[in-house]
Amino acid sequence: AARFDEPTQLGGFSEIIKPGAFKRSLASDAGPKIRAIYEHDSRSLLGRMGAGSLRLFEDAQGLAFEIDLPDTQLGRDLPVLVARGDVAGCSFGFIAQGENWEGETRHLTDVDLFEITITADPAYDTTTVQVRGKQPSTLTLARLYLEACR
């Protein structure tokens, strides 16, 4: 999950995601367009909320997701790479719609989320992803911080 209320260092400032920051985006007309991709490559589509293959939800800790991977080469390779630990993190693409600054800390209160990405080189080392369930084609995010696409 994108952990709420935990600071993340991003170069010259830190960022804290506040509870509810994703709520509007997930419920909006754009929610079905949110996609899961691999390595920030839009050609490497893994799932989409509108198709039901990507499920995103806020819980008490933050934002979590599940992906039903496609029956493609990438969809078959990714669980193997995750299980081996070669691919172990996640990033996000978003546009901040609500933010407050306290000194060098940005508090995100509302974001337009447009992608989650599974990656071998996450901007946040604390992110993890895991294969879960009897079907190896389902990936579940365990801990995820938010990365602004810049």
Residue locations for each model-derived region?
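Flexible, gly/proline-biased loop segments at the beginnings
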Residues: A1-P79, E102
